[in-house]
Regions:
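Sec/Tat signal peptide C-region and signal peptidase I cleavage site
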Residues: 20-24
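Short, surface-exposed beta-strand/loop micro-motifs that present aromatic residues
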Residues: 76-83, 143-151
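Short Gly/Thr-rich strand-loop-strand
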Residues: 46-61, 67-68, 100-147, 174, ...
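Bacterial N-terminal signal peptides that target proteins for export
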Residues: 1-9
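Short, compositionally biased low-complexity segments enriched in polar/charged residues
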Residues: 41-90, 94-96, 100
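Surface-exposed amphipathic alpha-helical segments
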Residues: 157-184
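Bacterial N-terminal signal peptides
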Residues: 8-18
Length: 184
């Protein structure tokens, strides 16, 4: 009887390990980004620049990315872009099979930001999701802010020209609420 119980527990354990990654694909990635109602007045959705971001589309132009995305377990992603006469706001989210994938993506983006040599942006930690960073510089219409963070198996980011830091953090928190509701 004891060996039967071990087999049963082993089968259950295998099922649970397989079930969590399989469920990652069941999240609608469109639910992970900002919607029109979330963004400041005057910003309009650019339908041509918005939509699902498959691994294939994300890998174009960088031969390293297909292998990295596969290794990280990226399932899919989604991006919305909103345009305004004074700027652009982009909301994106990448869905992974597990939290390790979102952690690896975050580390990659932070490393790329360090090595890219972008001058004039200040990096500040933010308490959104499991933690993240705000890269910001400039003011008024010339302001550029990028917020990146992760939550469970989601890596998320917001980038904007012409949107001030405090407003960006509010938008990131709104997107985080959408993410938390979608990946429960």
């Amino acid at each position: 009887m004891m060996s039967w119980m071990r087999v049963f527990l082993a089968v259950i354990a295998c099922f649970l390990v397989a079930a969590v990654p399989a469920s990652a694909g069941q999240v609608n990635p469109q639910l992970l980004v900002l919607r029109q109602a979330d963004v400041p007045a005057g910003f309009a959705l650019d339908r041509e620049q918005s939509g699902q971001r498959t691994n294939e589309t994300e890998s174009k132009g960088d031969r390293r990315l297909p292998a990295l995305l596969e290794r990280w377990g990226r399932v899919t992603g989604y991006e919305t872009e909103y345009d305004h006469r004074d700027g652009t706001l982009t909301s994106r989210a990448d869905l992974f099979r597990n939290a390790e994938g979102s952690r690896l993506m975050m580390a990659y983006v932070v490393d790329e930001a360090k090595t890219s040599g972008i001058k004039g942006l200040r990096r500040t930690p933010v308490r959104i999701g499991s933690g993240g960073w705000l890269y910001g510089g400039g003011s008024g219409a010339g302001a550029f802010n990028l917020v990146i963070w992760r939550h469970q198996r989601v890596f998320a980011g917001l980038a904007a020209f012409g949107v001030q830091k405090d407003r960006m953090l509010g938008l990131a928190r709104a997107q985080q609420r959408r993410i938390a509701a979608a990946v429960r």
